[in-house]
Amino acid sequence: MADKYKVVEIFKSISGESFHSGEVAVFVRLYGCNLRCKYGNNECDTPYSYEGNQYKLMTADEICDEVNKLSTNKFVVLTGGEPLIHPNIEFLLYEMAVLNHLKVDVETNGSVDIRSIVAKLMTIQNSSMLSENIIFTIDYKSPSCGMNSAMISDFAEMVDTINRCGFEVNVKCVITPTGEDIAAVKALVNRLDRISTLDTSQHLFISPVYGCDIAAIVDNMCKSELLSKCRLQLQIHKYIWDPEKRGV
């Protein structure tokens, strides 16, 4: 029997974050998350991805069929929730990237060891199409959201390993302008610079929490040699549409 995945929604919009911000994409949002982030009064912006059991069970074939109907550029964002906690997620990634030749940007929260996912992918087929067509955009959770302790303990080493395997890796630090958030990002940049092959100037992003003092974060970036290696990115979909609007 084919594996089935809990799908909350499939829709077409623009990628609002990270390296591929502004590109048209088909989003596949899977149900379930292992973290509960909260930034001050701001809860997770997609609580419906883990509350209420509002999802449809779909096979990889069914998901890819729906994506192919909507897509005009073969670019997919696999998001959640946390997509990598789904059992046998490697088979969905393989079907998308290899069998359907889709470019897949996997949005993951930094608490799941991607190295194990890559190892499972390689057991299906050690194909160059995997690294050519699968992107990992990894959130590094800052202290202010309460989930920093859930990050993989060797986060920088994990990023380096995946990058060395040939996959495009983007790291996104969602922060407020608090001192502890700024310090955490500085420590991460320093660690990545020392031990990894990741080009931080291209693939490390500072993403201000929607509604916070963005100017204060930019001021910190301008004053810090470490932070000035990062790129600022805004969740542009929240500025185009109502930030609570679904399906965009």
Model region roles, listed by residue range:
Residues 5-15, 24-25, 35, 39-133:
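Conserved Radical SAM active-site core
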Residues 1:
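Short, Gly/Pro- and small/polar-rich lid/capping loops
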Residues 19-21:
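A short catalytic or substrate-binding loop motif that flags glycine-/basic-rich loops and adjacent residues
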